[in-house]
Amino acid sequence: MLDFKPKSQRTDLKTAIEFLTKVMKRHCTAFILSDFFVRKSFKDELTIANRKHDVIAVQIYDQRTKDLPDVGLMKIKDAETGHEMFIDTSSYRLREAHNEYWLKQQTLLNDIFSKSNVDNISIATGEDFVMKLMILFSKRGQ
């Protein structure tokens, strides 16, 4: 297991994937666990890593980030930048815009995985991940 220590709270999958490619000299199976909500593209690095190794992407997300709950005013904080703000989750427009954004991000992410030929799985926190992993490995075995 590689122990990649980020220098800041900002997510930089690109650097972490490059680290994997440079450090692991022999072919390995590498699991990348992340929410994959990043600002920089990592498609090229992922493609290179998957040519050298067997890369499996595991997206872990909180269901509340997918389906914004209707709870009125909510204070949110960007974990990477520290920026805080209030949003009105009772706004149908806001929840719809958030849902559209989520779906767009998932489409882009699935496109990256597909073009990089990387097997992937999405798991919500609190969800039974064992069954999803069994299905993934069953598909990989065929």
Language-model regions, residue ranges each:
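Von Willebrand factor
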Residues: 1-28, 40-42, 60-62
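Von Willebrand factor type A / integrin I
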Residues: 22-26, 38, 44-142
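Acidic beta-strand-to-loop metal/phosphate-binding motif
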Residues: 29-35
